[in-house]
UniProtKB/Swiss-Prot annotation:
Binding site for Ca(2+) 1: 52, 54, 56, 58, 60, 63
Every EF-hand domain range: 39-74, 78-109
Species of origin: Danio rerio (Zebrafish)
Classification via Pfam families: EF-hand_7
Transmembrane parts of this sequence: none
Name of the molecule in the record: Parvalbumin-2
Length: 109
């Protein structure tokens, strides 16, 4: 598991179950349920680099769409509406992507 040593498997499973239905994803609830919002800045950065699949230093829209699959390979893709809402919540500088500092603020929101 990509988040081994950062998040507990049972917390991840519970969070994924809560947003299994289309259009039910809420990033605040998800980060709280997986326990990421209570983690240290270092652990949040580690999580960012797992989600940044192309190692560009940013989480782009296509990576956000597949966000849940970072936590479990069988998880669903986010809907377009969920992806756009997630991006707009995290992209504080309007560049169309989420940097590591923006991600940390989003997790702690």
């Amino acid at each position: 598991m990509a988040f081994a040593g950062i998040l507990k498997d049972e917390d991840v499973a519970a969070a994924l179950k809560d947003c299994a239905a289309a259009d039910s994803f809420n990033y605040k609830n998800f980060f709280a349920k997986v326990g990421l919002s209570a983690k240290s800045p270092d652990d949040i950065k580690k999580a960012f680099f797992v989600i940044d699949q192309d190692k560009s230093g940013f989480i782009e829209e296509d990576e956000l769409k597949l966000f849940l699959q970072n936590f479990s390979a069988g998880a669903r893709a986010l809907t377009d509406a969920e992806t756009k809402a997630f991006l707009s919540a995290g992209d504080s500088d309007g560049d169309g992507k989420i940097g590591v500092d923006e991600f940390a603020l989003l997790v702690k929101a």
